Amino acid sequence: MDRLKVILFITSTCLTTTLYAKQQVVCVFDPIGKSGDAFALAKDYALEAKNWGADLSLKAYVDERVAAEDLKVGKCDGAIISGLRGRQFNKYTGSLDAVGALTNMKTAINAYKLLSSPMAAKNMVVGPYEIAGLGTIGPAYLFVNDRSINTLAKAAGKKIGVFKYDEAQPKLVQQVGGQAVSVDVTNAGAKFNNHEIDIVPAPSVAFKPFELYKGLGEKGAIVRFPLTQISANFIIRKDQFPAGFGQKSRTWVASQLNRTFGVIAKYESDIPSKYWMDIPKNEQLNYMKMMREARIQLTKAGIYDPKMMNFLKKVRCKENPSNFECALNDE
């Protein structure tokens, strides 16, 4: 009997080793390709992942849609994509990008770290997929081709770029009376630079590679009021990775958040000061109220996850309990 147990143990160990001996293919969305920052960070991550029993083979994608589709059909064992694109795999974490939900770095870091803790692990798995890391690309700012567009009212009638796969953005544009123009990561910069659109939301990291200064010209500006944080998701097919990999990965990614935000701050400081435009406090409040109303409507419409909206409100109100929304209970 003892001999049989030993044989079974050795056999099961060999099977486990064989199962994870193959490399896990991770598809990395980076609009620049293999020479981009996202792919460089993924290479650093791949070295760390060896400590958790994974051997990652990285594949660069310049088209995020294809990366997500390849994850669905099993060509990728994991994919690093934006939270907007990742919402189809996990609505809870995919709602992190909700408009106005996380508008400053400190609140965002706290939210991401809480979501990466073991206490939140049950929300990270949906079907065969697991969120193995929550990162950020940075705040989304409005790039406008005319700095006279400094209030919500003045955005009425303007052509505003919206990502066609995000149901929320067209509704927001409609709310301010703008004209939604469908864009994707590959052509948003070109459409702004060629004056096909007047306004485009984008992170600071897009300023140089997409040459957005061309669209800004002499009259344009970047509104220094973040609409949201653009999250990055590492989504894996759970059964293709060693047991416990997801939590180890989330913990490590969360430990790098301060470093990540430091890099983002450097990108922002590298943008010439002449392009930044501050808006008055009363107009900031108008933005916050408009975005809050939009979040509530979009949650009722089933686009945002209500549990995530409630969680993010708690995080915001812990940071700033005097905020007007903290006395309200409809979100």
Sequence positions of predicted segments:
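Contiguous mixed-secondary-structure segments that line small-molecule binding/active-site clefts
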Residues: 72, 82-176, 212, 226-330
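Sec/Tat signal peptide C-region and signal peptidase I cleavage site
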Residues: 17-21
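Bacterial N-terminal signal peptides that target proteins for export
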Residues: 1-7
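Extracytoplasmic small-molecule ligand-binding "clamshell" domains
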Residues: 26-107
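Bacterial N-terminal signal peptides
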Residues: 7-16
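A ligand-binding cleft/hinge motif common to bilobed small-molecule-binding domains
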Residues: 83-93, 189-194, 199-225
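Bilobed "Venus flytrap"/periplasmic-binding protein-like clamshell domains
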Residues: 22-52, 130-194
